Amino acid sequence: MMITLRKLPLAVAVAAGVMSAQAMAVDFHGYARSGIGWTGSGGEQQCFQATGAQSKYRLGNECETYAELKLGQEVWKEGDKSFYFDTNVAYSVNQQNDWESTDPAFREANVQGKNLIEWLPGSTIWAGKRFYQRHDVHMIDFYYWDISGPGAGIENIDLGFGKLSLAATRSTEAGGSYTFSSQNIYDEVKDTANDVFDVRLAGLQTNPDGVLELGVDYGRANTTDGYKLADGASKDGWMFTAEHTQSMLKGYNKFVVQYATDAMTTQGKGQARGSDGSSSFTEELPDGTKINYANKVINNNGNMWRILDHGAISLGDKWDLMYVGMYQNIDWDNNLGTEWWTVGVRPMYKWTPIMSTLLEVGYDNVKSQQTGDRNNQYKITLAQQWQAGDSIWSRPAIRIFATYAKWDEKWGYIKDGDNISRYAAATNSGISTNSRGDSDEWTFGAQMEIWW
């Protein structure tokens, strides 16, 4: 009995140590950027984006503090079978003060189960909110294939010649459907859920060090019983993607071709906007009565083409390079589409394994389908950087920068709009007659960026 009692504290200590080790085995990942900047003509840092373009060249051209904090853990494992719980909370503020309150965005909360289906070894089933197999161009922060959101699916089914993934996700648009009360008045407007069904076949060997990925996305508006879409709403649409990835020069090149129809053209990345894509508006009658109407302007019947080439390569011991070239044409029946092309490079010269100089040059040109006018802008940034490693991808990084931008614009700028409406390619009320005009500006500052 004495021996047992003497062994008990040791057993408790060992058990506590094991449980403590398990409790600490939490994966912590994330992304963050923050800094301070000034504008040459005065005031805080100004950021530059061509009106109608869906992105901007980001080096020395980001005016917010943004962070994504991810916590995850493998909560169960038996042999090659496992369950993993993943979360992600994101924050964004204007970096104007010490105390800047904000509501966090709960972007991910999902469980992934690996090798749970005996006859599909290597596959993963999942459910919840998730960043799902996103494809982007880092230097312009542009996501061209991204169906992230609440959903479920199965991925990486090994077919021998490639891997198949199936998923369904959802995105909701405000004010998308309505119901009648009397006299055909749109009395109540309700958010509309849009469902996307995604099929991908990846890992198709095409040539030495080259692989092909093919994808089909179908999205449709899913209205609540008793509600309907505005007359003529696109309701649904398709997006087709082919992406070839070539490993080269210690990096990669990606060549992408995409085609989308109707509801899949607005965001152009695989998420649908199948209702009218707008909020309601209110009319006040002479007697003071207010009536809510659904906005009947339909903004996305048509098609979109996109051809994109981007990559990151090493040009020797001292030089790395990022680059992008893209052409996109949105042709809408309401004549509010755009033709956008962009080209840019970001070379990096490495003075030491942890210190470098970067130069980013980017040009955007956007033509209005309605007016035929073009907006164009080029932006040049020179940055001195200290980073954790000798790659153009090495982070964390601290950089000081100077940016110069020049633009000549003739359509679509809403001077006092927010970051969305100010750069909207087309709004539900038509294209604004305001313009940024022909001008230029320069900024300077410092920024940190990290991912882990």
Swiss-Prot record:
Keyword Signal assigned: yes
Domain of life: Bacteria
Signal peptide region: 1-25
CDD domains (UniProt xref): Maltoporin-like (cd01346)
Gene Ontology CC annotations of this record: cell outer membrane; pore complex
Record's note on what induces expression: By maltose.
Site (Greasy slide, important in sugar transport): Y31, Y66, W99, Y252, W393, W451
Protein name (database record): Maltoporin
Species per Swiss-Prot/TrEMBL record: Salmonella agona (strain SL483)
Originating gene: lamB
